[in-house]
Amino acid sequence: MMSPGSSHSAMISEMSGLTITQVNLSHAPYNMIAGAIGAVVLTILALVFKDYGEQHRQAYLAEQKESEIKVIEGVNVLYALAPLIPLVILVIGGTSLQQVPGLEWTKMGVPQAMLIGAIYGIIVTRISPVKITEEFFNGMGNSYANVLGIIIAASVFVAGLKSTGAVDAAISFLKESNEFVRWGATIGPFLMGLITGSGDAAAIAFNTAVTPHAVELGYTHVNLGMAAAIAGAIGRTASPIAGVTIVCAGLAMVSPVEMVKRTAPGMILAVLFLALFML
């Protein structure tokens, strides 16, 4: 959720007039606390369910005994820095650090920072510019298509709701019953993420329909919009049909439901934290 390339950050940035970096820095404390709540609860449940111990280690080693294990020796620091270059540029350019003499050039957008990172990658890896250009635009195209597909679907859904008058009725209700906003903005996307296994569509639909009216409802665009986005991501984490849950369950060779038994309690507490303290 704190990635400069997040579609949610870009959407809220456009609504609020802030840069993407400023949007991410605004919600970062709540994001990290929600993550910490989930991690602590997951650790406690691991102890309760006894998901640790020598028997688990021996079982894993027995399964991997016949597998070929490649040991990676040494780390190329220049390679490791490549993904961080755009992020560091955006963080410096989006904060007061850009006013330091010599750092004024860091004030730029996400595409420019990504291009600088790509050029750095070409230099340190000494790979063919043709190959890295193909991979760069291939990755950019796939990401753009996936994000744009969700945004179009959410926009069509919201347009349908607006045509029926449902959005206007909901906004009017929320203006008169302001206390329901915090729960609708968090529990709604959370439940949709839980049910569908994808929190992005629900959060984008909410942010398209409701977040533009955030000031009328007594909230900032950043807090209301990013609370919905984070809640949707939390709901996805607690969903047994989410892609990441299915993959992790396959790696652990357990049922996705067993995974959710351990992730859902922490996610529920995290979304309650967002509702009570972020909004």
UniProtKB/Swiss-Prot annotation:
UniProt superkingdom: Bacteria
Membrane-topology descriptor: Multi-pass membrane protein
Pfam family, one: DcuC
Main location: membrane
Compartments it resides in: Cell membrane
Protein's GO biological process: C4-dicarboxylate transport
Keyword annotations from UniProtKB, A to Z: Cell membrane, Membrane, Transmembrane, Transmembrane helix, Transport
Any one Gene Ontology molecular-function term assigned to this protein's record: C4-dicarboxylate transmembrane transporter activity
Keyword Transmembrane helix listed: yes
Any one Gene Ontology cellular component term annotated for this protein: plasma membrane
Transmembrane segments: 29-49, 77-97, 105-125, 147-167, 186-206, 240-260
Family named by the database record: Belongs to the DcuC/DcuD transporter (TC 2.A.61) family.
Protein name: Putative uncharacterized transporter HI_0585
